[in-house]
């Protein structure tokens, strides 16, 4: 069988989970050591170091891509692609406007006013890979939620390849990126982290990249914020006997083609369905240009597990906490209450994972490698800073004064207690006279 098929027995599920997590092993020590050196050098020497590394690894010094270049790139693209990008951008914008959290205020009781101000970050950097990994959809998915959130300035960095992708530059124009800078690799992340030359320090860095970029983002965290450290792509598909094997096979292959570490796993309650989907995957895969990648990723990280009950499949899905989770059953919404951990859940035969990658509106930047247990997809929330606001009248504070003093004294923080007591000391003195 093209797809390894096993019957759920406890051990089979654990093996699959273990193998999927093993794909997400951190960057090799030698990569982290190199990246640490570059980051430290840029922090110490600034622009001089950035230019040296850019000339060494990018082949030229960093430069700002002029707006006219973006306009020309937009005009050079196929009109059908521009129409698709514009439509996707509108859907992404609409979705994120629905979820945008706003400033709020609450009067709990007389004299107690509480609230929260919600503001977009001042400046955000987006890393966009070059070469074959330059995806215009990723530009839209990273930039538009930031713009909806109200980010003040959006800076995109991308390697200065011989022919910068017209599609990527057009997407930057459509998304409203403020500045595009031609610089890639660790040196780009370092410049955004510490600020150097005409590249200002940002508040947050988002976007995918290779192992060096991922290691640099990890080291940058704390000086600036980051979105997440993305691992290899993955999909789990829960399918019953009613699912169309052609559809499910195509969806599994759409993840398997990403790279040799991608994982495509089928969970079903039908051995016949598992076998049919496996055969269909092999038929379709042999017709695809990325056959060599698919063959290896499916052999290493693809499988089908047959359960007696799909609720057991849901329990496994929750442990795996996959990046993408498709539910292709007769009544997919009936399983939704049992599914808690996934980057995105796709319900039914007509919500395939590529719909989310390109067009539906929710961001396709999702937690991988089991981190959907505690991480959420990139969204407007990623680019917001929330600040608590507290306002009390004298009477309101006085009603809690002795409680606050008691709590502060129990922690031996006498200055805290005194901060409350001094506000009512004169009144107490008058009462004692």
Residue ranges with predicted function:
Residues 1-122:
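N-terminal Rossmann-like NAD(P)+-binding subdomain of aldehyde/semialdehyde dehydrogenases
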Residues 141-152, 173-175, 193-199, 217-219, ...:
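Alpha-helix C-terminal capping segments
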Residues 152-160, 264-270, 277:
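Short internal beta-strands
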Residues 318-433:
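C-terminal core of ALDH-fold dehydrogenases
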């Amino acid at each position: 069988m093209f797809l390894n098929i096993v019957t759920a027995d406890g051990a089979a599920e654990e093996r699959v989970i273990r193998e999927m997590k093993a794909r997400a092993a951190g960057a090799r020590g030698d990569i982290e050591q190199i990246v640490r050196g570059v980051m430290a050098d840029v922090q110490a020497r600034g622009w001089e170091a950035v230019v040296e590394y850019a000339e060494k690894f990018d082949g030229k010094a960093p430069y700002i891509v002029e707006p006219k270049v973006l306009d020309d790139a937009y005009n050079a693209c196929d009109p059908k692609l521009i129409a698709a990008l514009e439509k996707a951008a509108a859907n992404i914008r609409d979705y994120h406007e629905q979820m945008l959290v706003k400033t709020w205020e609450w009067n709990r009781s007389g004299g107690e006013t509480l609230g929260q101000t919600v503001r977009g970050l001042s400046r955000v950097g987006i890393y966009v890979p070059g070469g074959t990994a330059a995806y215009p959809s990723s530009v839209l998915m990273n930039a538009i939620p930031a713009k909806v959130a109200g980010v003040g300035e959006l800076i995109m960095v991308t390697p200065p390849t011989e022919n910068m992708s017209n599609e990527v530059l057009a997407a930057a124009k459509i998304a409203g990126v403020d500045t595009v800078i031609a610089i890639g690799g660790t040196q780009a992340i370092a410049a955004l982290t510490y600020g150097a030359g005409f590249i200002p320090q940002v508040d947050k860095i988002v976007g995918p990249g290779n192992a060096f970029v991922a290691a640099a983002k990890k080291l940058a965290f704390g000086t600036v914020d980051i979105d997440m450290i993305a691992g290899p792509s993955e999909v789990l598909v829960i399918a019953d006997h009613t699912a169309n094997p052609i559809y499910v096979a195509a969806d599994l292959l759409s993840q398997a083609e990403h790279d040799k570490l991608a994982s495509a796993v089928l969970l079903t309650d039908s051995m016949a369905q598992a076998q049919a989907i496996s055969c269909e995957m092999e038929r379709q895969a042999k017709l695809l240009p990325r056959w060599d990648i698919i063959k290896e990723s499916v052999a290493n990280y693809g499988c089908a597990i047959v359960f007696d009950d799909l609720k057991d499949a849901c329990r496994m899905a929750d442990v795996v906490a996959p990046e993408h989770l498709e539910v292709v059953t007769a009544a997919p919404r009936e399983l939704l209450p049992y599914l808690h951990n996934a980057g995105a859940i796709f319900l039914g035969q007509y919500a395939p994972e590529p719909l989310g990658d390109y067009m539906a509106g929710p961001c396709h930047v999702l937690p991988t490698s089991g981190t959907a247990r505690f991480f959420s997809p990139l969204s407007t929330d990623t680019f917001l800073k929330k600040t608590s606001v507290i306002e009390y009248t004298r009477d309101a504070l006085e009603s809690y004064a002795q409680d606050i003093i008691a709590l502060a004294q129990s922690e031996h923080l006498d200055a805290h207690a005194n901060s409350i007591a001094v506000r009512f000391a004169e009144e107490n003195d008058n009462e004692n006279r």
